[in-house]
Amino acid sequence: MIKNNLLLLASIFFTNYGFSSPNILIILADDLGWNDVSYHGSEIKTPNIDGLISSGVELDRFYVQPTCSPTRAELMTGKSAIRLGITRPISKNQKLGLGLNEKILPQYLKEMNYQTYLLGKWHLGAYTPEYFPTRRGFDYFYGYLQGGNGYWDHVHGGGYDWQKNEKLLRKEGYTTHLIRDDAIRIIENHDDQSSMFLNINFGAPHTPNEAPQESINKFNNLESENRRIHAAMVHEMDDAIGKIINALKKKNILDNTIIFFASDNGGLPPNLELDPGILNLPYKLGICDWERPLSFEAVSYTHLTLPTMDSV
């Protein structure tokens, strides 16, 4: 479970190295499959994600929930999705969200003088403003509240969903690029007097299958059109991760930053006509519990502990 892995790593690093209040960068991919990264042998080259593996720690028995909202709820609370009552993706008009009685990760970090940012997908409640991320401990939110979004038009279920701090924001551009650019802006403008918690939830490579044509053209060797687009979406995300890490380097704060990377669940083959390798077949069909990598760029220090984890 996510809570056990985070608590174990936090305890080890804090006990052995004694660093306090590092910056924390959590990056979640959406529906990233086992064979979508080149360090697992994929034809999709992901040098920046691979770099996290080569210089950090990979947990190859790191389990997440089978769908979006449950995994995100567990990550925010350190509690099981069943206990939280979130066992399926939260639909657009559903009167449900991450329980308002739950104290979540950014709220704890704010008490430790962290500036807290969420970019990208929320998917933990949007029926009333009380569920919005800026009411749950995030100082800043830039992204979408629902479970999916058009990469170019930012429309989900017939409604426009691109937000900035509880207000609709009419914005042009590819979703992955918008998230990347805002992350870089936040890093460049970060005040060193406080620590930064930056939670980046990419939409990629979740459907709809959309990517810049120049990236799609890089994968003309792939027979399936859907696979080419999917590969381009992963490529764009990997490139964005590389640029974000470079921004940390330029700001001279990479060595004091914990980087956590994972996927919320595995790939979604019925929509994508994907290579069976993405699913780790023949034993798994469709989305189910997946082994995901937990990676750190700098693993020798951390202060990432949740009081709720201690009590679970």
Positions of PLM-derived features:
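Sec-dependent signal peptide recognition
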Residues: 2-9
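Formylglycine-dependent sulfatase
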Residues: 3, 18-304
